[in-house]
Structures are given as C-alpha cells and as structure tokens.
Amino acid sequence: MELLSKKKVYITRGKYKKNIWEFPGGKVKKHENIVHALKRELLEEVGIIVLKINFFQYIEYIYPEKKIKLYFFLKKKWKGRPYSIEGYTYLWKRLCHLRALDFPLANHSVINALKKNNILIKFR
C-alpha cells in the first residue's frame, strides 16, 4: 500500500525487523474485505482516512518459512496528515531513492513496477 504525495512515497521502518523499510499496511481480518482492511490499517498506523484508492498490483511471494499475498493500492486522496501513530520511524522518499534502502524481498517487484510505470507522475 503506497501513499503518494508530490512525487514521494511514504515508508516506515518495519515492525518486526527494525532495519527494514516497508510500505504501510497489514493483515486482512476474517470479517473484512481487502479495501476495508486497507482503510482500517491506514487509520490505525498512519492516522489518515482514505478517500480515493487505485488497485496497483497483486503479488504472491514465497519465503522459506511462509507464503504471503500482497495487494498494493495507490492512495491518491486522503484526509489527515500521515504520521506514525505507533511511533515507528517514517520518511517521505523519492521513488528513485528507494533502491538504496532495505525492503522485504517481496516489495522489490512493486518498487520496480512503480518506476517502470512512472506512477508518481500519473497519480500525484
């Protein structure tokens, strides 16, 4: 789940691996659909109310210990000022600078897709 603003992407330090950067997001609860989970997680973690989103990419990634499913959405419009409610370090980074940071392996393909599609210009 990417927050995009003025050609920059909102990222935060990982909850479980402090040296890894992540896009905001979380797990879908049993009673939720993906969009409800997205809105809940962003309100809980980043303090914003999502007003407009666009589906971007679905990824299944297999780590040695587990298989994960990731749904990436682009948040085009929101209410509130994004910050880390849970107190994790966060940054607004230009897409061209993301490769210099450590991200989970599962996120590499979405970073490449954002760059390839010039998303930050299309969706700002």
Swiss-Prot record:
Family per similarity comment: Belongs to the Nudix hydrolase family.
Motif (Nudix box): 26-47
Domain of life: Bacteria
Biological process per Gene Ontology, one example term: DNA replication
Organism: Buchnera aphidicola subsp. Acyrthosiphon pisum (strain APS)
Record field: catalytic activity: 8-oxo-dGTP + H2O = 8-oxo-dGMP + diphosphate + H(+); 8-oxo-GTP + H2O = 8-oxo-GMP + diphosphate + H(+)
PANTHER family per the UniProt record, alphabetical: 8-OXO-DGTP DIPHOSPHATASE, NUDIX HYDROLASE FAMILY PROTEIN
PROSITE patterns: NUDIX (PS51462), NUDIX_BOX (PS00893)
Pfam assignment, any one: NUDIX
Protein name: 8-oxo-dGTP diphosphatase
Protein task: Specifically hydrolyzes both 8-oxo-deoxyguanosine triphosphate (8-oxo-dGTP) and 8-oxo-guanosine triphosphate (8-oxo-GTP) to the related monophosphates, thereby cleaning up the nucleotide pools and preventing misincorporation of 8-oxoGua into DNA and RNA. It prevents replicational errors by removing an oxidatively damaged form of guanine (8-oxo-dGTP) from DNA and the nucleotide pool. 8-oxo-dGTP can be inserted opposite dA and dC residues of template DNA with almost equal efficiency thus leading to A.T to G.C transversions.
Gene Ontology MF terms in the entry: 8-oxo-7,8-dihydrodeoxyguanosine triphosphate pyrophosphatase activity; 8-oxo-7,8-dihydroguanosine triphosphate pyrophosphatase activity; 8-oxo-dGDP phosphatase activity; 8-oxo-GDP phosphatase activity; metal ion binding
Keywords linked to the UniProt accession: DNA damage, DNA repair, DNA replication, Hydrolase, Magnesium, Metal-binding, Mutator protein
Residues annotated for Mg(2+) binding in this entry: 25, 45
Keyword Aminoacyl-tRNA synthetase in record: no
Enzyme class label: hydrolase
Cofactor(s) annotated in UniProt: Mg(2+)
E.C. designation(s): 3.6.1.55
Alphabetical list of InterPro entries matching this protein: MutT-like, NUDIX_hydrolase-like_dom_sf, NUDIX_hydrolase_CS, NUDIX_hydrolase_dom
Domain Nudix hydrolase: from-to ranges: 1-118
